[in-house]
Amino acid sequence: MDKLCYLPKHPDIKLYQSDELFKINTDTEVLGEFLNIYKEDIVLDMGTNTGALMLYANMFHPKKIIGLEINSKALVLAKKNMELNNITNYELINDDIITYTNELVDVIICNPPYFKTKEDNKSNDSYKNLAKHESELKLDLLVKSISRNLKDNGTLFFLYLTSRLDEVVLEFKKNNLVIKEMKFVYDTNKEYSNVCLFRAVKNGIQGLVVDKPVIIKRDK
């Protein structure tokens, strides 16, 4: 059954979520708040799920927002969420991120699965599991697709595990994505950063800024 919720800190922006699909979490929130989009931009949300990051992108009133998602059930809910918020400048595409090729875009948003798949999890292909583990969406193939679909000087907003930072840097460099901004995300229940936010520019000029970290406060 679909449940009506709202974006964290934005009670005026409502969305439906389902127990059968991956729900928004703090990763969604910190990436959504990290975005910076211009009105003339065409935005692609890779792996849009039920459209939460499309709703964050819509706050900037871009020219067009495209949601790419392999799960057709998630897209049904994404469409419902766009209509719920009276968004008309959108397109939803049911396709595989790895093979997807279409119009080049100004901005790509991506909150991908980032846990490496253990051998005992390979047989578990539920949508929730695929949304967390990279069994069907390896980092190298994902970054190739991002670069292929992004205009020169286009911007990527990306979230990934801090423990795999070296892999992200390597794959970005292979695919001409220059990291311009990084922001580490900390949880008050942990002594280390779990995830990191990236803003990268395709064929951009070198020059990296490491921002002040995001601190997620949790009850102990």
Task: Name every feature range the model reports, one short phrase each.
Residues 2-42, 48-59, 196-199, 203, ...:
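SAM-dependent Rossmann-like transferase core, predominantly class I methyltransferases
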Residues 112-141:
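Mobile active-site "lid"/loop adjacent to the S-adenosyl-L-methionine
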